């Protein structure tokens, strides 16, 4: 019992420590509000019109910054649905049999009705030993959260949360509004910073706040601009941070552009179809996080597919609908021999991509 108790104490201590970066950002944000709204706008600005304009614009950016930051922190990451979890009997088989063909057969049977297109580097079905589930496309296991996260991008210590399918849009808006917030502060604070620096204004308590505020805003603007630009590039290519470091592996091999549908569709996959919600931290992303449209460079004859533009869906035995996955239009000549998703009851003997490949081995990606 002692090790268990000490382990629980360590876990609680780690949970507390994980909040330190969030507390730091919150304190810095609170100080910046005091320094800008009080010391700069109310104390140092003499022009009433300038005060009003700066305070209105500042509070708008401040509100959007806090809102998007809050949503990024407290939106729970989405986990794979029950269709991807192994049944009790399948778990028993995996535990009873030695690793080998028996394990592969269990995974093949479990995955035959699931819309999974990606594989491990060795071509195996992506299976998580920790969560005991077959990983959906773009899903990864987070060692910090100790869960499989749908469309995991990365675990961010500054929000103490996993950034994935459920909150990636919020994270992007958080970066955007924090960058605008810092740029606005630096731009409107610059003239007062110069005047204090050259002793053009009296040496008051506001001097420290105004000068340090400019340094902090300028410093964060540089770091945020590079990070925001990088994630804009990721969105334009329909990649996650993990996929940028390691290209996704499909049945035919690696494909760095496997999920890219073109700039417009890539944007809409994150921000949604209704543009009125794009700048608001409300969930509007497309899909369910378990299945994603993909453009495959080469058609896999064993992999069922549906031409782009068709509204067909696939159903598993639990009546969970998954959208069909189109190929690139340049590969339309391959569609003549392609198969379509069918209900498991209609074709019980056929599996999904790679299910009949005896070379598949089970790996645990963490």
From Swiss-Prot:
Changing residue 361 to A: No effect on subcellular localization. One of its GO terms (cellular component) is glutamatergic synapse. It is an enzyme of class 2 (transferase). Its main location: other. The keyword NAD does not apply. It catalyses: L-cysteinyl-[protein] + hexadecanoyl-CoA = S-hexadecanoyl-L-cysteinyl-[protein] + CoA; L-cysteinyl-[protein] + tetradecanoyl-CoA = S-tetradecanoyl-L-cysteinyl-[protein] + CoA; L-cysteinyl-[protein] + octadecanoyl-CoA = S-octadecanoyl-L-cysteinyl-[protein] + CoA. Its EC number is 2.3.1.225, 2.3.1.-. Residues 37-47, 191-207 are lumenal. InterPro entries: Palmitoyltrfase_DHHC, PFA4/ZDH16/20/ERF2-like. The active site is at 156 (s-palmitoyl cysteine intermediate). Autopalmitoylated. Residues 298-366 are annotated as: Mediates localization to plasma membrane and recycling endosomes. It is found in: Postsynaptic density; Postsynaptic recycling endosome membrane; Cell membrane; Endoplasmic reticulum membrane. Changing residue 356 to A: No effect on subcellular localization. The DHHC domain is required for palmitoyltransferase activity. PANTHER family: PALMITOYLTRANSFERASE ZDHHC16. This is Palmitoyltransferase ZDHHC2. It comes from Mus musculus. The lineage of its organism: Eukaryota, Metazoa, Chordata, Craniata, Vertebrata. The gene is Zdhhc2.
């Amino acid at each position: 019992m002692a090790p268990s108790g000490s382990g629980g104490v360590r876990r609680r201590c780690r949970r507390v420590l994980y909040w330190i970066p969030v507390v730091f950002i919150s304190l810095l944000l609170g100080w910046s509000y005091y320094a800008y709204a009080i010391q700069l706008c109310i104390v140092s600005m003499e022009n009433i019109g300038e005060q009003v304009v700066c305070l209105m614009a500042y509070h708008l950016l401040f509100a959007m910054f806090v809102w998007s930051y809050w949503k990024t922190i407290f939106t729970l990451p989405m986990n794979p649905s029950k269709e991807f979890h192994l049944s009790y009997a399948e778990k028993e088989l995996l535990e009873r049999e030695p690793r080998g063909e028996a394990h592969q057969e269990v995974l093949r049977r479990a995955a035959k009705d699931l819309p999974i297109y990606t594989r491990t580097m060795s071509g195996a079905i992506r299976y998580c030993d920790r969560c005991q589930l077959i990983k959906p496309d773009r899903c990864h296991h987070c060692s910090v959260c100790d869960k499989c996260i749908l469309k995991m991008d990365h675990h961010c210590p500054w929000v103490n949360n996993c950034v994935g399918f459920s909150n990636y849009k919020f994270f992007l808006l958080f970066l955007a509004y924090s960058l605008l917030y810092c740029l606005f502060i630096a731009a409107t604070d610059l003239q007062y910073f110069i005047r204090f620096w050259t002793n053009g204004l009296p040496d008051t308590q506001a001097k420290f706040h105004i000068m340090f505020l400019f340094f902090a805003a300028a410093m964060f603007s540089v770091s945020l601009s590079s990070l925001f630009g990088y994630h804009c590039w990721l969105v334009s290519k329909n990649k996650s941070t993990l996929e940028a470091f390691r290209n996704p592996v499909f049945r035919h091999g690696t494909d760095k552009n496997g999920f890219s549908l073109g700039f417009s569709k890539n944007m809409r996959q994150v921000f949604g179809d209704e543009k009125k919600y794009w700048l608001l931290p409300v969930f509007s992303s497309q899909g369910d996080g378990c299945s994603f449209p993909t453009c495959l460079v080469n058609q896999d004859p064993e992999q069922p597919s549906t031409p782009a533009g068709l509204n067909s869906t696939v159903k598993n035995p639990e009546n969970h609908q998954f959208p069909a996955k189109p190929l690139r239009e340049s590969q339309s000549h391959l569609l003549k021999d392609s198969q379509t998703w069918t209900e498991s009851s209609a074709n019980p003997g056929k599996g999904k991509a790679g299910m009949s490949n005896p070379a598949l081995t089970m790996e645990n990606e963490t």
